[in-house]
Amino acid sequence: MADWVTGKVTKVQNWTDALFSLTVHAPVLPFTAGQFTKLGLEIDGERVQRAYSYVNSPDNPDLEFYLVTVPDGKLSPRLAALKPGDEVQVVSEAAGFFVLDEVPDCETLWMLATGTAIGPYLSILQLGKDLDRFKNLVLVHAARYAADLSYLPLMQELEKRYEGKLRIQTVVSRETAAGSLTGRIPALIESGELESAIGLPMNKETSHVMLCGNPQMVRDTQQLLKETRQMTKHLRRRPGHMTAEHYW
């Protein structure tokens, strides 16, 4: 049984009509960057809960979550309506294996995300531990519109902090926007456009690819890399070149 604790909302940041971030103070147990927990509210006499990844570094007591409002959702519209001072239930122990401990050493670590799935990478990069074993870090955030790239300022801040080791790239699929590639991640890999923009190759000799977000993107990218680059899923018992987390 999960141990639930009561958290207090300290900040609600509305990025767009649908995207928002919640900052919460709660007595949770220590977690590993890249992990997720569950948020819950009592609705009509029952606890409605969903899993959300931590965006904040584990050493930051401001627990941050990046959410999208599902119009007919049972929980997300209620979470979006919370105000500072309101209470929210949080599972105290984090879960998940989308963490650096599960990633083998390589020259270039590619971190690819769609939508709100940028969260785990931001947690990992803000903490900044266990990254010395990679020569290059690449963070790619794909969204429909440029307005949905909520954490671009933080990505740019991190890029400066890593002094050339981290390269960032945004992707939009429904419009063209300055500084962003246009299209979907699998197609941009297939055409070579993503590697060209970054200036690094994505191959099994030098790279490990982390994939987080839309299950279709994850599946399509895995299939493409398997077929065209002979890259394989990474398992503890059989090391490979791809680590993935589906976001729904």
Swiss-Prot record:
Annotated EC: 1.18.1.2, 1.19.1.1
Localization of this protein: Cytoplasm
Binding site for FAD: R50, A51, Y52, S53, Y66, K74, L75, S76, T116, Y247, W248
A Pfam family it matches: FAD_binding_6
Catalytic reaction list: 2 reduced [2Fe-2S]-[ferredoxin] + NADP(+) + H(+) = 2 oxidized [2Fe-2S]-[ferredoxin] + NADPH; reduced [flavodoxin] + NADP(+) = oxidized [flavodoxin] + NADPH + 2 H(+)
Keyword Repeat: no
Binding site for NADP(+): A143, R144, S173, R174, R184, N214, P215, Q216, D220
GO BP annotation list: cellular response to oxidative stress; heme catabolic process
One MF annotation (Gene Ontology) recorded for this entry: ferredoxin-NADP+ reductase activity
Root EC class: oxidoreductase
Cofactors named for this entry: FAD
InterPro entries recorded: Cbr1-like_FAD-bd_dom, FAD-bd_FR_type, FNR_bac, FNR_nucleotide-bd, FNR_type-1, OxRdtase_FAD/NAD-bd, Riboflavin_synthase-like_b-brl
Protein name (record): Flavodoxin/ferredoxin--NADP reductase
Species for this entry: Shigella flexneri
